[in-house]
From Swiss-Prot:
UniProt region (Disordered), positions on chain: 277-322
Short name of any one Pfam family annotated for the protein: Pox_A32
Signal peptide bounds: none
Name of the protein in its database record: Uncharacterized protein 015R
Amino acid composition bias (Acidic residues), ranges on this chain: 287-305
InterPro entries in UniProt: A32L (IPR006758), P-loop_NTPase (IPR027417)
Upper lineage: Viruses, Varidnaviria, Bamfordvirae, Nucleocytoviricota, Megaviricetes
Length: 322
């Protein structure tokens, strides 16, 4: 039987990295699929650790945060959501357009984690969520979408994912769905054996959809995140935490180990979890003639804190490393 070598992947190869940070190559959209206990959280921790030196800010949307508190102390409470809404993506989009224009590619990066809250497939039909998949690389965003089970993404959205981490799946039905949604680059008859071989001892399979190659094994890698009992270090620049803690009363972390990032951060533009989210009549997103709350609805006035009516705040935070 022919043996096919599966190479180990390096998180440092994922954009942004030291090679791409000064360029317009743009961001990466990653999907992580694994059941509880598979090693999914350890992988997410490793992803955060690998990018903390070049990404100054993060927004987390986690449907399980109230139960497990995984991101507590990793990202400020101000920027942790417990429920997904397309309006969060809309505000991230507007913030990133302004941040990239004001600060350039190097200083405008944002990490967005959407963890265990994508069970409603209809959410992916919203125009802003689709824009994140289609054009998110131009927003300078690293997107990590983690879920326990395969999501029913439409084919055009699946084709927009840059990379997929797959943990071991023993259920044949779910394994077949995983293959159909994300892993069809591997010959179908080989897929069960490849998954069984690669995904042992908390390893996972990584499929790189950005590779232009005729050989499937050039796009398939294995990865095992290093396990550590220590808490995840705070993610983001000091001023990012300082701003958030000043609004919530959360205690500032004692240690920051990220590389110093210079320049302005449009912190006021980040969507804050403490603010009320826009709902659209119980729908998953706005209709063609619904842009958000009317002037008669509750919300911040022009003089109050938050986004102004045109979605642009004049607040800038610049003292990054006091």
């Amino acid at each position: 039987m022919e043996q096919v070598p599966i190479k180990e992947m390096r998180l440092s190869d994922l954009r942004p990295n030291n090679k791409s940070i000064d360029t317009d190559l743009g961001g990466t959209k990653l999907v992580v699929i694994g059941k509880p206990g598979s090693g999914k959280s350890t992988l997410i921790k490793a992803l955060l650790d690998s990018k903390r030196h070049i990404i100054p800010c993060a927004v987390v949307i986690s449907g399980s945060e109230e139960a497990n508190g995984f991101y507590k102390g990793v990202v400020p409470d101000l920027f942790i959501y417990h429920q997904f809404s397309p309006s969060i993506i809309d505000r991230i989009h507007r913030r990133q357009v302004k941040a990239k224009a004001e600060m350039g590619s190097k200083k405008s990066w944002l990490l967005v984690v959407i963890d265990d809250c994508m069970d409603n497939a209809k959410m992916f039909n919203d125009k802003e969520v689709r824009a994140l998949f289609k054009n998110g690389r131009h927003w300078n965003v690293l997107v990590v979408i983690a879920n326990q089970y395969v999501m029913d993404l439409t084919p055009d959205l699946r084709s927009s994912v840059d990379g997929v981490f797959l943990f071991r799946e023993n259920n044949v039905t779910y394994r077949d769905k995983t293959y159909a949604n994300f892993a069809s680059v591997v010959p179908k008859k080989l897929y069960p054996t490849v998954m069984e071989t690669v995904c042992q001892n908390y390893r996972c399979m990584f499929i790189d959809n950005t590779k232009a190659t005729d050989n499937w094994h050039d796009s398939v890698f294995w990865y095992k995140a290093p396990y550590s009992k220590s808490a995840v270090a705070p993610f983001g620049a000091r001023s990012y935490w300082k701003y958030a803690c000043s609004k919530t009363g959360e205690e500032m972390p004692a240690v920051f180990d990220n590389v110093k990032i210079l320049g302005d951060l449009l912190l006021k533009e980040l969507p804050e979890a403490g603010e009320a989210l826009v709902t659209y009549g119980g729908k998953d997103g706005p209709s063609d003639n619904e842009d958000g709350p009317s002037d008669d609805e509750d919300g911040p006035s022009d003089d109050e804190e938050g986004l102004s009516k045109d979605g642009v705040s004049e607040y800038y935070q610049s003292d990054l490393d006091d």
